[in-house]
């Protein structure tokens, strides 16, 4: 997580900024990585109360821009009247191009009294409406509270002196940058001409069927007959466009129509009026078209628009009183609100109504808005921008917290005093290491703790050695959410989810889909779809897992298991390795949900939970045990794992179970044991030694068992127990020293148990090995894959590479690592391996070879982009470069391979010219010609600079052009007689003689004569 302040505090800046915007902005930790700058903008307004003492403040809490809201005063006739818009202190479009809102909060209160008033009267109602402003049906003081049923989105009768606080909470996390409607360079004859670039993302479109064979009939009146053809609700506070057409038909000669569109504000007044048609004559017997094509810029929308109206005025040329006028109309139009569907742009809205406040009082609106801003090119020259950091843990934690905001008491509207008191609680929510004292007092502690455990990086930061717990998301999170989690199809995830394997080439592991498993601990025998009843526990038990601690202080023995996937019975593929602990008793609550409900019996009839119910374990135990996966071992504790691991099979844990049954240690034994006990008390060898050894070493443990392990205990059980420190109990009861002989016909269960040893040479396995060798001889790629696997196995990093593959499913990180790895002959290679690295001469490729490699890289990159004609040979003929824009356009239009070194300029649009002003050219010429105080640049030099701007289509000089201009300036300065005279060179400083030290007042200086 980001922004660590000290060892005890770990803050999530984004959620802190959301809940407490006054603490400042923070980058949104999503995957939209744009260089931006963070900025806090304040909004402060003193609103004067009208004659009725009532008013309404409309806030747009999620609007990504300068608009904050609007203020309306209630008139004596019961209607609202628009007062003014509420904006941020700075006009953002003047300096910035793009914006994302991070957080916002606003406070409304009154603390001033007009003359003659001695008491502060009035109350406030506030509500957050999950809709647009035009959709409100009752905006009266009391009716406002019926806009929502959510108790956390409304408050009533708050004293105006106490005030209310409006908090902006995100409604979506899929947020892109929004164009702010900033001005763009343009030249026009009209001095008021303005050109802006508005947002075109996520528009809101209203489609209105204005008329469907509507019949109009009336008698002639002087001045015409006016009707409202339609009126519809729309919402707009940014630029909009209106398009469409109406078709009129008439049988009356000389009819004249006029059409006017009105955009009406929330108070019912016309904000914008546009005449669509004036004195438009209709021709009898034909279709008369009336097109609509209107653009309304943001600058003309001075208050929120909530409806649109179209009026038709009908008249008749030379008409007389009593003349009949009739026509019919059909058609529709569309109103497009630019950026209207961006989350938070028009919905939700927060309305704050005040009532019975003294006339002339001042209602203060103050708040802060935090933004991510991308500056315009001029400001970007002097403003440093930075990339946002993608932090999935912080983003996941924020989403989890806000998804439970109703249960956690997080509101959108607050009494100001209550919001101030909750700031300490918000700090606890944002601090991942806080003890949640205040949250516990409110009863929110258990919820927040559960969300912290689900949020992946949080567990790793609370318990640094518990980083592997980060893999518990996915299916594990779905299990923890219990029966409330559902898949996209609507069915429970527990019945439809599948765990993912290491990469796309390995088949997905079936967990709960058919209540079976294909994850085995050996490479010899795979059960054929054994039925496992009750893999998933009840939802109540699963929800209880929220309260489990990660650390368990209990005696245990440890053993590693290699988990593999299988395509069929003879083609296994290694996937992962995991450490398991043997604990005494029935402890299914410590197991992951995927392992619960499954057990196997021993020869004595006792159960071992966590094993697949296939056969019996060839052990005689005196009690019941549970096998649980773990992620680490501390001094006297083990760290449990919630990875969705199915029940295990095989005999890797026999030695650990036997040791646990005999000695029953009080603390975990810090040695991993592996081996299978047979009927003669001997410990048989196992496979995947290096993989299990690497698993043990990763946890800081040694591995014990037969073979070349850290602790070579031999193949005899008696020798094994003598080399371990233990506290023997019931020493005379060691059934493994004198295990009775079991005949071969003891039954299928014993045969399966004996066959479950992890590795045995069989004819089938030998045949499979020969088949792989034959395939490697034929397929070089398969040979390379086997070589890589052998290299991983020899170095003991198979498990590490498998875990890395799980975290890098698309191999992006691996490709970047290989691309940036030091090559033979590089400086880092010579520094590490000397002049010959890896046993070969450390020299780089030849120029020809390097050029061929470059051509190949360019070709592969083009191939990933779907440009298949750019083969390495074509790239070499094209001057060792990729296709130009003209070549790409030629290929896209003709689907023919373009000729190398042919630019096809006819297929490329000419670059648009942009004029540069004389002032801009003069400033550039002055800056290049010399520093301030020197001679002004001559006209000839200004003309040279103007030529550069003309060549560059209005842009400044590049580096080469700048060098030429500097040389030209130097030549002109030497030829200019009016140039400033050169400054004289400073004379070297001659050190002065050091004055004699000051003698005391009564001390006489000693001369040479005195010394003689």
From Swiss-Prot:
Residues 975-986 have a biased composition (Basic residues). PROSITE patterns: BIRNAVIRUS_VP4_PRO. Residues 1003-1012 are annotated as: Interaction with VP1 protein. Keywords: Capsid protein, Host cytoplasm, Hydrolase, Metal-binding, Protease, Serine protease, Virion. The active site is at residues 652, 692. The keyword Metal-binding applies. One of its GO terms (cellular component) is host cell cytoplasm. GO terms for biological process: proteolysis. InterPro entries: Birna_VP2, Birna_VP3, Birna_VP3_dom1, Birna_VP3_dom2, Birna_VP4_Prtase_dom, Viral_coat. Its EC number is 3.4.21.-. Residues 513-755 form the Peptidase S50 domain. Specific enzymatic cleavages yield mature proteins. The capsid assembly seems to be regulated by polyprotein processing. The protease VP4 cleaves itself off the polyprotein, thus releasing pre-VP2 and VP3 within the infected cell. During capsid assembly, the C-terminus of pre-VP2 is further processed by VP4, giving rise to VP2, the external capsid protein and three small peptides that all stay closely associated with the capsid. Residues 971-1012 are annotated as: Disordered. It comes from the Viruses. The record marks 441-442, 487-488, 494-495, 501-502, 512-513, 755-756 as: Cleavage. Pfam families: Birna_VP2, Birna_VP3, Birna_VP4. A divalent metal cation binds at residue 30. GO terms for molecular function: metal ion binding; serine-type peptidase activity; structural molecule activity. Capsid protein VP2 self assembles to form an icosahedral capsid with a T=13 symmetry, about 70 nm in diameter, and consisting of 260 VP2 trimers. The capsid encapsulates the genomic dsRNA. VP2 is also involved in attachment and entry into the host cell by interacting with host ITGA4/ITGB1. This is Structural polyprotein.
């Amino acid at each position: 997580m980001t922004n660590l302040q000290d060892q005890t505090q770990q803050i999530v800046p984004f959620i802190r900024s959301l809940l407490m915007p006054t603490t400042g902005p923070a980058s949104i930790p999503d995957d939209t990585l744009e260089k931006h700058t963070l900025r806090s903008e304040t909004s402060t307004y003193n609103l004067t109360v009208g004659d009725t003492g009532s008013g309404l403040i409309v806030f747009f809490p999620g609007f990504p821009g300068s608009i904050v809201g609007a203020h309306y005063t209630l008139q004596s006739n019961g209607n609202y009247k628009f007062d003014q818009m509420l904006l941020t202190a700075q006009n953002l479009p003047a300096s910035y191009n793009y914006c994302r809102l991070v957080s916002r909060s606003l406070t409304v209160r009154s603390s001033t009294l007009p003359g003659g008033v001695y008491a502060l009267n009035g109350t406030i109602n506030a509500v957050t409406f999950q809709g647009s402003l035009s959709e409100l049906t009752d905006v009266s003081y009391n009716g406002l509270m019926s806009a929502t049923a959510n108790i956390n989105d409304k408050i009533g009768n708050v004293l105006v002196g106490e005030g209310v606080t409006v908090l902006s909470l995100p409604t979506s996390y899929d947020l892109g940058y929004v164009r702010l409607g900033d001005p763009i360079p343009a030249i026009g004859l009209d001095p008021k001409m303005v050109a802006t670039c508005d947002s075109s993302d996520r528009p809101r479109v209203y489609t209105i069927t204005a008329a469907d064979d509507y019949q109009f009939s009336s008698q002639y009146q002087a001045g015409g007959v006016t009707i409202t053809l339609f009126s519809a609700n729309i919402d707009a506070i940014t630029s909009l466009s209106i398009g469409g057409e109406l078709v009129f038909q008439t049988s009356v000669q000389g009819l004249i129509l006029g059409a006017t569109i009105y955009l009406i504000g929330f108070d019912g007044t016309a904000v914008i009026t546009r005449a669509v048609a004036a004195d438009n004559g209709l021709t009898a017997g034909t279709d008369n078209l009336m097109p609509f094509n209107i653009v309304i810029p943001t600058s003309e929308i001075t208050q929120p628009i909530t409806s649109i109206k179209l009026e038709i005025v009908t008249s008749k040329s030379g008409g007389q009183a009593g003349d009949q006028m009739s026509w019919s109309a059909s058609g529709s139009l569309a109103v497009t609100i630019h950026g209207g569907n961006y989350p938070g742009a028009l919905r939700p809205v927060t309305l704050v109504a005040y009532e019975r406040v003294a006339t002339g009082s001042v209602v203060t609106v103050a708040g802060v808005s935090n933004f991510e801003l991308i500056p315009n090119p001029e400001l970007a020259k002097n403003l440093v921008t930075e990339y946002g950091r993608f932090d999935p843990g912080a983003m996941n934690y924020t989403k989890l917290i806000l998804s439970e905001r109703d249960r956690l008491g997080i509101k959108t509207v607050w009494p100001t005093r209550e919001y101030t008191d909750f700031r300490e609680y918000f700090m606890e929510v944002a601090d991942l290491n806080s003890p949640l004292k205040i949250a516990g007092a409110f009863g929110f502690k258990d919820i927040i703790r559960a969300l912290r455990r689900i949020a992946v990086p949080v567990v790793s930061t609370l318990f640094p050695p518990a980083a592997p717990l980060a893999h518990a998301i996915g299916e594990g999170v779905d299990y923890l959410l219990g029966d409330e989690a559902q898949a996209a199809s609507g069915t429970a995830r527990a019945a439809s989810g599948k765990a993912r394997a290491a990469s796309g080439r390995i088949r997905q592991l079936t967990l709960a889909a058919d209540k079976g498993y294909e994850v085995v601990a050996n490479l010899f025998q795979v059960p054929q779809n054994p039925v496992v009843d009750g893999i998933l526990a009840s939802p109540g038990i699963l929800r209880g897992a929220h309260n489990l601690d990660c650390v368990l202080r209990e005696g245990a023995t440890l053993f590693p298991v290699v988990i593999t996937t299988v395509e069929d019975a003879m083609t296994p593929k290694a996937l992962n390795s995991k450490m398991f602990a043997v604990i005494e008793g029935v402890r299914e609550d410590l197991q992951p949900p995927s392992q619960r409900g499954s057990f196997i019996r021993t020869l004595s009839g006792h159960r071992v939970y966590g094993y697949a119910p296939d056969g019996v374990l060839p052990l005689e135990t005196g009690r019941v045990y549970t096998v649980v996966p773990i992620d680490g071992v501390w001094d006297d504790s083990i760290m449990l794992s919630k990875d969705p691991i199915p029940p295990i099979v095989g005999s890797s844990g026999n030695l650990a179970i036997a040791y646990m049954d005999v000695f029953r240690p009080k603390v975990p034994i810090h040695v991993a044991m592996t081996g299978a006990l047979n009927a003669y008390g001997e410990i048989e060898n196992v496979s995947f030694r290096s993989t299990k050894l690497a698993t043990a070493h990763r946890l800081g443990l040694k591995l014990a068992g037969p073979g070349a392990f850290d602790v070579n205990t031999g193949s005899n059980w008696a020798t094994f127990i003598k080399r371990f420190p233990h506290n023997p109990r019931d020493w005379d009861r060691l059934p493994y020293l004198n295990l009775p002989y079991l005949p071969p016909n003891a039954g299928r269960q014993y045969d399966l148990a004996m066959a479950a040893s992890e590795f045995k040479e069989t004819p089938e396995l030998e045949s499979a090995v020969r088949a792989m060798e034959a395939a490697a001889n034929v397929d070089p790629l398969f040979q390379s894959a086997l070589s890589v696997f052998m290299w991983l196995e020899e170095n003991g990093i198979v498990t590490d590479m498998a875990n890395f593959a799980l975290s890098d499913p698309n191999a992006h990180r691996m490709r970047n690592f290989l691309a940036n790895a030091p090559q033979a002959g590089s400086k880092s290679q010579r520094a590490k391996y000397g002049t010959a690295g890896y046993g070969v001469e450390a020299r780089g490729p030849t120029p020809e070879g390097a050029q061929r490699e470059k051509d190949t890289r360019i070709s592969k990159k083009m191939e990933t982009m779907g440009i298949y004609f750019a083969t390495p040979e074509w790239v070499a003929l094209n001057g060792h470069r990729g296709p130009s824009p003209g070549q790409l356009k030629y290929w896209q239009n003709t689907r023919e391979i373009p000729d190398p070194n042919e630019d096809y300029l006819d297929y490329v649009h000419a670059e648009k010219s942009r004029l540069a002003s004389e002032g801009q050219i003069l400033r550039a010429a002055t800056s290049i010609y010399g520093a301030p105080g020197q001679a002004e640049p001559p006209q000839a030099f200004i003309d040279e600079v103007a030529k550069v701007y003309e060549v560059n289509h209005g842009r400044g000089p590049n580096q080469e052009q700048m060098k030429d201009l500097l040389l030209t300036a130097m030549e002109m300065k030497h030829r200019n007689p009016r140039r400033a005279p050169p400054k004289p060179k400073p004379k070297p400083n001659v050190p002065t003689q050091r004055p004699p030290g000051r003698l005391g007042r009564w001390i006489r200086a000693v001369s040479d004569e005195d010394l003689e």
